[in-house]
Every structure is written in C-alpha cells, then in structure tokens.
Amino acid sequence: MDAPGALAQTAAPGPGRKELKIVIVGDGGCGKTSLLMVYSQGSFPEHYAPSVFEKYTASVTVGSKEVTLNLYDTAGQEDYDRLRPLSYQNTHLVLICYDVMNPTSYDNVLIKWFPEVTHFCRGIPMVLIGCKTDLRKDKEQLRKLRAAQLEPITYMQGLSACEQIRAALYLECSAKFRENVEDVFREAAKVALSALKKAQRQKKRRLCLLL
C-alpha cells in the first residue's frame, strides 16, 4: 500500500483522460463544502451541516486534456483529527481553505493545516483558497467583526500566507455567487498535472541512471 501523500500515478480512465485526487481541508464552517457543492452540483447549501467525509466528482478541460477530478471533502473539527489523514492517501493536490471573514480560520492555515498537510502529504502541491469573499461587503458581518476589534482578511494577507506555506497559488472565491469557483478547480488541476509530469520525469531519470 502506498504511503499517504505519495504522488499517485493514476491510470487514465479513458483515452486522453486523466484522473486526479484533490483533498480539501480547512476549519469547520470555512466554506469547503459549499465550494465543492457549487462546483460539482451547481447548488449552494443554504444551511450549514458539518461534513465528515464526502466525495464529489467533476470534469474539467485543461488545454486539450479532459480531466476527472475526484474531490474529497474533510471534517475540520478536532474530533476528526485522527480520521482525516486517511483521506490523504494517493492525493495529487491539497486545497487549504479559510474564511476571509474569520481571522481564526486564517491563523489556523499556518498553525494547524500547513503542518498537518506537510506531515501526511510530503512533496504534494498545495493551493491556498480564501472563501466567502462576498461577505467582505456584508454590513452585518463587518459590524460583528469590528465589535470584536477584528477586520476581514485582505487579499495581500492571503498572498502572504501563500508564500509562508510555499503553496503553488493563492486564489479567492465566493461559492454563493459562483465567483472564481471554476477557476479554483481549473488552476488546481493545472498545478496537479504539472507536479505529476515532473514526478514522472524524475522517475524516468532514475530508471535511466539505474540502467
């Protein structure tokens, strides 16, 4: 059995079609499930229901390639810290999400999610996602934040965290208004395919050296 995080050399399910496994992590309630549901099913969940482990499937075209995305939602709550690593096996890419209106979820990118992902998915590319960008203009949400002497997380703060965790990309989106949702998964697929190609080249190089 492959170790968690090993770059999976997934067999293509059909001529010219690639298959990728992408795991999405982040604090509970940060917008992971909404992002996945809007992208794969076209529906935005109006009520919050914590996920345990769910799998969604979608297709995306990258260049001339048809790519099947197997998208794994995970539970962000501490109760599932021991179970969540099971999702990481044979992952091609990890999306780390946070809520731009929840500074704690942003802090946890560095405190919790980056250490966990790099431990279980060594060498696997990451993409950082700032979710719920529509709420930056929500007066009630802003009032609540400022009452606690807090401010929304800015785009530049997101870029800074991306650099600190050495993620391949930083992207922002609003699942509710479908803003940048398709871009998130198209760009994630590009990053994963590029990493796969690099891993395959390195494998060939090692074989040549052995021969």
From Swiss-Prot:
Statement: the UniProt record of this protein carries the keyword Secreted: no
Propeptide stretches in the record: 209-211
Principal subcellular localization: membrane
Pfam families: Ras
Intrachain disulfide bonds: none
Modification sites for N-acetylmethionine: 1
Lipidation, S-geranylgeranyl cysteine type: 208
Sequence positions bearing Cysteine methyl ester: 208
UniProt topology in membrane: Lipid-anchor
Keyword annotations: Acetylation, Cell membrane, Cytoplasm, Cytoskeleton, GTP-binding, Lipoprotein, Membrane, Methylation, Nucleotide-binding, Prenylation
Keyword Ribonucleoprotein among record annotations: no
GO cellular component: cytoskeleton; cytosol; extracellular exosome; plasma membrane; secretory granule membrane
Annotated GO biological process: actin filament organization; cell migration; regulation of actin cytoskeleton organization; regulation of small GTPase mediated signal transduction; signal transduction; small GTPase-mediated signal transduction
Positions annotated to bind GTP: 26-33, 73-77, 131-134
InterPro entries: P-loop_NTPase (IPR027417), Small_GTP-bd (IPR005225), Small_GTPase (IPR001806), Small_GTPase_Rho (IPR003578)
Cell compartments where the protein resides: Cell membrane; Cytoplasm, Cytoskeleton
Ranges spanned by the short sequence motif Effector region, renumbered to the chain: 48-56
A molecular function (GO) term: GTPase activity
Stored SUPFAM superfamilies: P-loop containing nucleoside triphosphate hydrolases
Origin superkingdom: Eukaryota
Protein task: Plasma membrane-associated small GTPase which cycles between an active GTP-bound and an inactive GDP-bound state. Causes the formation of thin, actin-rich surface projections called filopodia. Functions cooperatively with CDC42 and Rac to generate additional structures, increasing the diversity of actin-based morphology.
Classification via PANTHER family: RHO FAMILY GTPASE
Protein name: Rho-related GTP-binding protein RhoF
Source organism per UniProt: Homo sapiens (Human)
Gene label: RHOF
